[in-house]
Amino acid sequence: MQATADRALERAWEVLEAVPDPEIPVVSIRELGILREVRRAEDGHLEVVITPTYSGCPAMSQIAEDVGHALEAAALGPYRIATTLTPAWTTDWITDEAREKLRAYGIAPPTGNCGGGAGQAASEQPIAFIPKLPAPACPHCGSKHTERLAQFGSTACKALYRCIDCREPFDYFKPY
Protein backbone atom coordinates (compact mmCIF):
# COMPACT_ATOMS: atom_id res chain seq x y z
CA MET A 1 0.00 0.00 0.00
CA GLN A 2 2.83 2.43 0.89
CA ALA A 3 4.57 1.82 -2.46
CA THR A 4 1.33 2.64 -4.31
CA ALA A 5 0.88 5.85 -2.31
CA ASP A 6 4.50 6.86 -2.94
CA ARG A 7 4.08 6.19 -6.67
CA ALA A 8 0.93 8.34 -6.71
CA LEU A 9 2.87 11.21 -5.12
CA GLU A 10 5.69 10.80 -7.63
CA ARG A 11 3.16 10.77 -10.47
CA ALA A 12 1.47 13.90 -9.09
CA TRP A 13 4.81 15.74 -9.06
CA GLU A 14 5.46 14.61 -12.65
CA VAL A 15 2.03 15.76 -13.80
CA LEU A 16 2.25 19.10 -12.02
CA GLU A 17 5.74 19.73 -13.41
CA ALA A 18 4.01 20.28 -16.76
CA VAL A 19 1.50 22.87 -15.50
CA PRO A 20 2.59 26.20 -17.02
CA ASP A 21 2.34 29.55 -15.31
CA PRO A 22 -0.69 31.22 -16.95
CA GLU A 23 1.10 34.56 -17.31
CA ILE A 24 4.47 33.17 -18.44
CA PRO A 25 3.65 29.89 -20.22
CA VAL A 26 7.27 28.95 -21.00
CA VAL A 27 7.90 28.08 -17.35
CA SER A 28 6.05 25.72 -15.05
CA ILE A 29 4.63 26.56 -11.65
CA ARG A 30 7.23 24.17 -10.23
CA GLU A 31 10.11 26.00 -11.93
CA LEU A 32 8.84 29.33 -10.57
CA GLY A 33 8.61 27.95 -7.04
CA ILE A 34 4.83 28.39 -6.85
CA LEU A 35 4.27 24.64 -6.41
CA ARG A 36 5.48 24.10 -2.86
CA GLU A 37 4.41 20.65 -1.79
CA VAL A 38 2.47 17.57 -2.81
CA ARG A 39 1.52 15.25 0.05
CA ARG A 40 -1.00 12.67 1.10
CA ALA A 41 -3.41 13.94 3.78
CA GLU A 42 -4.60 11.74 6.65
CA ASP A 43 -7.96 11.26 4.91
CA GLY A 44 -6.19 9.91 1.81
CA HIS A 45 -6.71 12.99 -0.35
CA LEU A 46 -3.83 14.31 -2.37
CA GLU A 47 -2.95 17.75 -1.05
CA VAL A 48 -1.19 20.27 -3.28
CA VAL A 49 0.26 23.41 -1.69
CA ILE A 50 0.85 26.51 -3.81
CA THR A 51 2.20 29.96 -2.93
CA PRO A 52 1.45 33.09 -4.96
CA THR A 53 4.28 35.22 -6.26
CA TYR A 54 2.64 38.02 -4.29
CA SER A 55 -0.46 38.01 -2.11
CA GLY A 56 -2.69 39.71 -4.68
CA CYS A 57 -1.60 37.65 -7.67
CA PRO A 58 -4.62 37.46 -9.99
CA ALA A 59 -3.38 34.23 -11.58
CA MET A 60 -3.82 32.10 -8.45
CA SER A 61 -7.37 31.00 -9.23
CA GLN A 62 -6.26 30.01 -12.74
CA ILE A 63 -3.25 28.15 -11.33
CA ALA A 64 -5.48 26.24 -8.89
CA GLU A 65 -7.88 25.39 -11.71
CA ASP A 66 -5.03 24.20 -13.95
CA VAL A 67 -3.61 22.07 -11.12
CA GLY A 68 -7.04 20.50 -10.62
CA HIS A 69 -7.46 19.76 -14.32
CA ALA A 70 -4.00 18.16 -14.47
CA LEU A 71 -4.70 15.93 -11.46
CA GLU A 72 -8.11 14.92 -12.84
CA ALA A 73 -6.68 14.14 -16.28
CA ALA A 74 -4.10 11.88 -14.63
CA ALA A 75 -6.83 10.15 -12.56
CA LEU A 76 -4.94 10.76 -9.34
CA GLY A 77 -7.99 10.51 -7.11
CA PRO A 78 -9.50 13.01 -4.71
CA TYR A 79 -7.40 16.10 -4.06
CA ARG A 80 -7.33 19.43 -2.27
CA ILE A 81 -5.44 22.54 -3.25
CA ALA A 82 -4.19 24.73 -0.43
CA THR A 83 -2.70 28.19 -0.77
CA THR A 84 -0.11 29.30 1.75
CA LEU A 85 1.33 32.77 2.16
CA THR A 86 4.10 31.83 4.59
CA PRO A 87 6.87 31.77 4.00
CA ALA A 88 6.30 34.41 1.36
CA TRP A 89 7.39 33.51 -2.15
CA THR A 90 10.72 34.92 -3.29
CA THR A 91 12.41 35.09 -6.67
CA ASP A 92 15.20 33.04 -5.10
CA TRP A 93 12.91 30.03 -5.63
CA ILE A 94 13.01 30.38 -9.43
CA THR A 95 15.14 27.52 -10.79
CA ASP A 96 18.19 28.13 -12.96
CA GLU A 97 16.40 26.37 -15.83
CA ALA A 98 13.44 28.73 -15.50
CA ARG A 99 15.77 31.75 -15.51
CA GLU A 100 17.21 30.57 -18.82
CA LYS A 101 13.72 29.97 -20.23
CA LEU A 102 12.66 33.47 -19.16
CA ARG A 103 15.70 34.98 -20.88
CA ALA A 104 15.04 33.01 -24.08
CA TYR A 105 11.40 34.17 -23.97
CA GLY A 106 12.51 37.81 -23.79
CA ILE A 107 12.06 38.40 -20.04
CA ALA A 108 15.13 39.35 -18.03
CA PRO A 109 15.27 37.10 -14.96
CA PRO A 110 15.70 38.72 -11.55
CA THR A 111 19.21 39.79 -10.60
CA GLY A 112 20.72 39.29 -7.20
CA ASN A 113 19.55 37.19 -4.31
CA CYS A 114 16.81 38.17 -1.91
CA GLY A 115 18.09 35.85 0.80
CA GLY A 116 14.89 33.87 1.26
CA GLY A 117 15.85 30.31 0.48
CA ALA A 118 13.14 27.73 -0.06
CA GLY A 119 11.50 26.76 3.18
CA GLN A 120 13.03 29.57 5.21
CA ALA A 121 10.45 31.00 7.56
CA ALA A 122 9.65 34.68 7.23
CA SER A 123 10.64 35.22 10.86
CA GLU A 124 14.11 33.84 10.08
CA GLN A 125 14.74 36.31 7.28
CA PRO A 126 16.64 39.44 8.25
CA ILE A 127 14.80 42.70 7.79
CA ALA A 128 16.82 45.04 5.61
CA PHE A 129 16.38 47.75 3.06
CA ILE A 130 16.40 46.49 -0.48
CA PRO A 131 19.77 47.40 -1.97
CA LYS A 132 19.99 49.05 -5.37
CA LEU A 133 20.55 46.21 -7.77
CA PRO A 134 22.47 46.46 -11.02
CA ALA A 135 20.44 47.01 -14.17
CA PRO A 136 19.29 43.74 -15.72
CA ALA A 137 21.01 42.48 -18.84
CA CYS A 138 18.99 42.70 -22.03
CA PRO A 139 17.57 39.24 -22.83
CA HIS A 140 17.87 40.02 -26.56
CA CYS A 141 21.51 41.13 -26.92
CA GLY A 142 23.01 40.65 -23.44
CA SER A 143 23.93 44.33 -22.97
CA LYS A 144 23.93 45.73 -19.44
CA HIS A 145 23.13 49.20 -20.80
CA THR A 146 19.45 49.16 -19.93
CA GLU A 147 16.99 51.60 -18.45
CA ARG A 148 13.71 51.22 -16.62
CA LEU A 149 10.76 52.74 -18.45
CA ALA A 150 8.01 51.79 -15.99
CA GLN A 151 7.81 50.17 -12.56
CA PHE A 152 5.18 47.76 -13.88
CA GLY A 153 5.34 45.74 -17.08
CA SER A 154 2.88 43.26 -18.54
CA THR A 155 2.15 42.00 -15.00
CA ALA A 156 2.65 43.53 -11.55
CA CYS A 157 5.63 41.27 -10.84
CA LYS A 158 7.55 42.62 -13.83
CA ALA A 159 8.97 46.05 -14.71
CA LEU A 160 9.32 47.45 -18.23
CA TYR A 161 12.90 48.09 -19.38
CA ARG A 162 14.57 49.06 -22.64
CA CYS A 163 18.02 48.21 -23.91
CA ILE A 164 19.99 51.32 -24.80
CA ASP A 165 22.18 49.38 -27.26
CA CYS A 166 19.67 47.34 -29.30
CA ARG A 167 16.70 49.61 -28.38
CA GLU A 168 14.42 46.63 -27.71
CA PRO A 169 11.93 46.84 -24.82
CA PHE A 170 11.69 43.90 -22.43
CA ASP A 171 10.04 42.81 -19.20
CA TYR A 172 12.21 42.33 -16.13
CA PHE A 173 11.05 39.93 -13.43
CA LYS A 174 11.43 42.06 -10.30
CA PRO A 175 13.38 40.45 -7.44
CA TYR A 176 11.50 40.11 -4.18
Q: Can you name each region flagged by the protein language model?
A:
Residues 1-176:
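Domain-level signature for proteins that mediate thiol-based redox and metal-cofactor handling
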